[in-house]
Amino acid sequence: MGKIKKLPEHVIGKIAAGEVVAGPYSVVKELVENSLDAGATKIEIEIKSGGKSYIKVKDNGEGMGREDLLLSIYEHTTSKINDFDDIYNLSSFGFRGEALASIAKVSRIVITSNNGSESHRLEAIGGKIKSVNEYPLVEKGTIVEVYDLFFNVPARRKFLKSEATEKRYVVEYVEKFLLSNPDVEFIFRADNEIIYNARASNLEERFKLIFPEVKEYTLINGKYVEGIISSPNYHRKNRTGQIFFVQKRFVMDKMLYYIFENGYGEALVDHPYGVLFINVPSKLVDVNVHPQKLEVKFSNPNIIYSDITRTVREALKKFVSKQIFVKPINEKKTKSEVSSFETKNVNFSNDSFQDKFNSVFKESVNHVDYSKNMLFDISEKNLEVKNDVVILKKRYVLFEMEDGIYIMDFHAAHERVIYEQILEKLKVGIEKIDLIIPIEIKVGKSLKQIVIEKLDELKENGFEIKVENESVKILSIPSFIKPSDVDDIFKEIIDEYRIPSMGTKNMKHIIADKACKSAVRTGYDITEGEAKKLIEEVFKRNLTTCPHGRPLFLKITFNEIDKYFDRT
């Protein structure tokens, strides 16, 4: 008998469901999209236990009759398209006929619907209909209730996150619907707590609701893009404040992130906030390239990208008095931008000098082994700095050691030393400062959920916090953090946890990383004495990179210098 065999239908169904249903948040996503496609103007969402045990979505849409209700939980049944070409003229969210079918296969589901002339309730377990009966539903619309998600796929259920984390994922997705559909009323409850009660309004009001920390923003309106963006003064360390929609579908597209930030040009600090709606004719965009429709393809992307950059740049004139330099989208770095030495002011009559220098310099740089995150072993060096140090462009320190010449980035070095000092304090025990006046920080709902998730861990690391409805109050802080820095540092610490890959990162390292921002900056007038002390501290601790992995030193050995001067 051959080794290849056809999988049973129930196995195929569960595997396929996994492509659509990643967790409670994706159930909410699919059900809310169905409600919007049904023309709902009011949608109520409720979850319990992070959505693991119960999810409910109720709408006032057009509803379904008995015949449609029976077909709704079977795969590839849809009212949106008739043949493949219809995909390129879509105005709805759903079209594959997979969502309800996939959800039904991995849960116990109850659907109650009234289309204005008849009302029925369907109950199914694991994708199999158990009953369909007439049911008195007073209001026109549909109620979908999902119980015990992944009850029949224990391996998938095992990999769900904690209830608090799954709840946060749902909150974040609900926020995307609030932004993309400001004209729809949303009520969202979690474990009997009202998270959002958002009346129909407009984008500006919804933006303020989701991002209360942003005080400077402006609406934008281009040929293909519209939305709302923050001033350069408001930004995050990651792109969680950037939410993009194409035809009102939420998308995650690296190129769109880049193009948006490109519009900020030289005004860019970190990652600004932005809610963008890209509107193009349906036939010019393909949404059928990702199982969860998170990616899109444009038939002519350059005109879209140019419009985004131009529109953002024009809008920012409201905030930035000086002219913003916007790099061309496809601009490549020139040699002068990537070279470690500037040579434009040096005029050598003999080109061979520069060629020879570049050859030796390249050889010294090639000694760096980034894979080991180590430039060279400094643990056994004589820590004495020979002669005086030289400060270069208020950025670098040049000094001589026994084996060569070193150039050190003093900001990166100071940052790493502070990072190590803070880690040492955190490991020994936290010394806290009780604040006479608590520091109140405005946060959105999803950030508040992260604080709740990490409350105990934050307390262990020196932050005493009281969570309130629209804000968090910080009652005590670690002694090494200045009260004036608390707002920025705390937001950055919490923001780290919005990125799933950061969830496993030790909070002590995150706090140390953020707190070391007090390091001297490039441009600081560092004295020779300060520079020598910093060099000694770095060598004593055997440090070679900053907390983010960038090298602290460039080293050119005397052997390499001798080689250049033909003294070998």
From Swiss-Prot:
Q: Which UniProt keywords apply?
A: DNA damage, DNA repair
Q: Which residues form a coiled coil?
A: none
Cross-referenced InterPro entries: DNA_mismatch_repair_CS, DNA_mismatch_repair_MutL, DNA_mismatch_S5_2-like, HATPase_C_sf, MutL/Mlh/PMS, MutL/Mlh/Pms-like, MutL_C, MutL_C_dimsub
GO MF terms on file? ATP binding; ATP hydrolysis activity; ATP-dependent DNA damage sensor activity; mismatched DNA binding
Record's signal peptide: none
**Biological process per Gene Ontology, one example term:** mismatch repair
* GO cellular component, as recorded: mismatch repair complex
Reading the lineage from the top rank, the first entry is Bacteria
Indicate the family of this protein.
Answer: Belongs to the DNA mismatch repair MutL/HexB family.
Q: What does this protein do?
A: This protein is involved in the repair of mismatches in DNA. It is required for dam-dependent methyl-directed DNA mismatch repair. May act as a 'molecular matchmaker', a protein that promotes the formation of a stable complex between two or more DNA-binding proteins in an ATP-dependent manner without itself being part of a final effector complex.
Q: By its UniProt entry, which PANTHER family does this protein fall under?
A: DNA MISMATCH REPAIR PROTEIN MLH, PMS, MUTL, DNA MISMATCH REPAIR PROTEIN MLH1
Annotated protein name in UniProt: DNA mismatch repair protein MutL
Native source species: Thermosipho africanus (strain TCF52B)
Organism placement in taxonomy: Bacteria, Thermotogati, Thermotogota, Thermotogae, Thermotogales
